Amino acid sequence: MQEIKITEQEAGQRFDKLLCKYLNKAPKSFLYKMLRKKNITLNGKKASGNEKLAKGDCVKLFLSDETIQKFSEAFSGYTNVSLDILYEDEDIILINKPVGMLSQKAARSDESLVEHLISYLIQSHALTEEDLRTFRPSICNRLDRNTSGIVAAGKSMAGLQSLSQMFHDRTIGKYYLCLTAGIIEKPSQVEGWLFKDERTNKVEILFQERPGSARIITEYRPIKSHDGVTLLEVHLITGKTHQIRAHLASVGHPLIGDHKYGASQINREYEQKYHLQSQLLHAARLQFPVCTQTLCNVSKKEFTAPLPKQFYRIAAEKGVL
């Protein structure tokens, strides 16, 4: 038998979510069967799994040590990647993600920002391997592999939940910088619907709603135009897959370097001259609203991430910085 006392770190999550982390190799069907048979209890009583855990709750697993060991897998994704940390407190962390790094794993063998973050937190003694059995830090805003910039993550359950809720409610201002083809002279807000083809991982911008499509709103303002390009600041109102890339391409201003939605001839020119392999899109700024309790330290604050060197060099040479 093993006993888990719920601490402030684990409090606030569903009981079955905690069990999935603690016995991370066990099928969900096994966990629910153990709950039904009272082999796993909450505060000495039978539980369904959908209970919200509170600090001080007592979880008991009436399972053999061999069974627990069989269904538990320790964190093994240690990395030594140095993170560009923009802000950190006890509950949240903001990281400037480089181009080429996954935000989250796409396959089991992948290394992503999440693994680098967990390694950093363990090495800095902000987290222990035992902590990882009941709580895993996670990111709240995912960027494409080849999009750089600010990624926000929760270090504690309270931080993760509060931050995730703010992104869900769209109360955090998300501002991107991108280099687009063509001259844009005036600020604009464009709207439409986005339809994602899961098979090709590509999206289509529609001007009429279609079953399965999502409403999108993108605001942008030109910072400077010169030599056939515009440095644009984009305010992402909604945040859907490839929204900025596809939406700007649909109005005739594809991102420089975007091989999925961009102009192939323009991309070839930049690849030959600058060895550019990906879109020039950077999550440059986060604006927090008035925050209380867990996020009070970032209330009404703004955080910025510097442009990657290649983006800065190209923008400077094109005369838009």
Language-model segment annotations:
Residues 1-321:
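RNA pseudouridine synthases
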